[in-house]
A protein has these predicted regions:
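N-terminal first-folded block
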Residues: 8-38
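Solvent-exposed, charged interface segments at domain starts and junctions
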Residues: 1-2, 38
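A short, surface-exposed loop/turn module that caps and links secondary-structure elements
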Residues: 29-54
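A periodicity- and composition-biased signal for non-globular, repetitive helical segments
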Residues: 11, 27, 33, 49-50, ...
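Enriched for short, Lys/Arg-rich terminal
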Residues: 2-7, 11, 18-22, 55-61, ...
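Short, surface-exposed linear patches
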Residues: 25-27, 45-47, 75-78
């Protein structure tokens, strides 16, 4: 699988603390090897739009779509508690 990032994601990502960015890259590596990796807790977020949610850590989630052989990373946001 390949990875593509939206401009929206890139804007949000650049504003995040470095520690969160590093955690995201670790989680992205898990996603590329196994979408069912327990650390990701990946699940369908919006069935109609084909949007998935996965965990960065306790505080952040990232959202993506699967388009052909590409994970399109849509956004990364603080998880509301």
């Amino acid at each position: 699988m390949k990875v593509a990032r939206t401009p929206h994601f890139l804007r949000n990502f650049s504003d995040l603390p470095t520690v969160v960015q590093k955690k995201f890259y670790k989680q992205l590596a898990y996603l590329l090897t196994d979408i069912r990796h327990p650390s990701l807790r990946a699940k369908k977020y919006d069935e109609n739009a084909g949007i998935w949610q996965a965990r960065v850590d306790n505080d952040f989630r990232f959202y993506f779509q699967i388009v052909d052989d590409t994970y399109l990373i849509l956004s990364i946001i603080k998880h509301p508690k």
